[in-house]
């Protein structure tokens, strides 16, 4: 299949890319806002990009008029945690995927434990088998 990026819409390109890159790892990203509000959200545009130094990348769609809480928190603090999602965590992760008010903690929505991190202010998901603390 050939696809000319100049001839398709953004949503069409998105659907193509998410169906073409499989299996797609999920970054379950936890952040803390400057005011202390917690956020937890899944992102499917995520991957490891280097082992030395260890680097990962996530892509968050920017909504100029109303940025996602995850992006807003990373911009405010420069810190986030990527939590690994295993099969047991899938139902809880799915509950966090909706649009929630900024003051709503998706940890509570999903029934997950926000565990304190040692190196960053953002908590990690205690139920996750692996996490990666990150700083911009």
Which sequence ranges carry the predicted segments?
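Active-site-proximal mixed secondary-structure blocks
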Residues: 1-39, 47-136
């Amino acid at each position: 299949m050939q696809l000319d990026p100049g001839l398709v819409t953004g949503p069409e390109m998105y659907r193509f890319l998410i169906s073409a890159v499989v299996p797609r790892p999920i970054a379950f990203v936890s952040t803390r806002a400057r005011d202390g509000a917690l956020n937890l959200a899944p992102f499917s545009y995520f991957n490891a990009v280097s082992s030395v130094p260890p680097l990962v990348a996530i892509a968050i769609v920017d909504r100029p008029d109303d940025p996602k809480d995850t992006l807003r928190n990373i911009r405010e603090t420069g810190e986030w945690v990527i939590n690994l999602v295993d099969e047991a965590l899938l139902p809880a992760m799915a509950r966090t995927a909706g649009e929630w008010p900024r003051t709503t903690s998706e940890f509570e929505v999903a029934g997950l434990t926000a565990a304190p991190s040692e190196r960053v202010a953002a908590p990690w998901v205690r139920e996750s088998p692996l996490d990666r603390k990150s700083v911009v």
